[in-house]
């Protein structure tokens, strides 16, 4: 858990270490479905001067009878489309959760141990002139039980 916290702090700290530019390099957004499984709040940082390679980290949840914490992390690449401020968003990520749920497998882990889902993603992203970003994506969940089709939708603020 300490590793995940340190990763989050390191990514967040880079926001304040780089100079200002006209391209907004940071996003904070809410996501339904997607990498956080049911819902999450995420921070994303573009690592290049223009849209391209980025990294993200978040905190989310999923629910069966109880709520379970998830920690999605990942990298993505934004491919610019002809339409202004439109991108194909392709990424690879992993989501840690406290327990594997029946939603993503046949049975609960009897030890109540942590569980990792690997989540590739492909989607469409749009940045508006008012520094709002939104995204829709296909984010299949790959784990020891197989591949589960999954979708995500995000909306947030660029800064």
Give the positions of each predicted feature:
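Outer-membrane beta-barrel transmembrane domain signature
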Residues: 23, 35-38, 47-54, 60-159
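OB-fold/S1-family RNA-binding modules
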Residues: 43
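Transmembrane beta-strand segments of Gram-negative outer membrane beta-barrel proteins
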Residues: 22-32
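Bacterial Sec-dependent N-terminal signal peptides
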Residues: 1-24, 155, 159
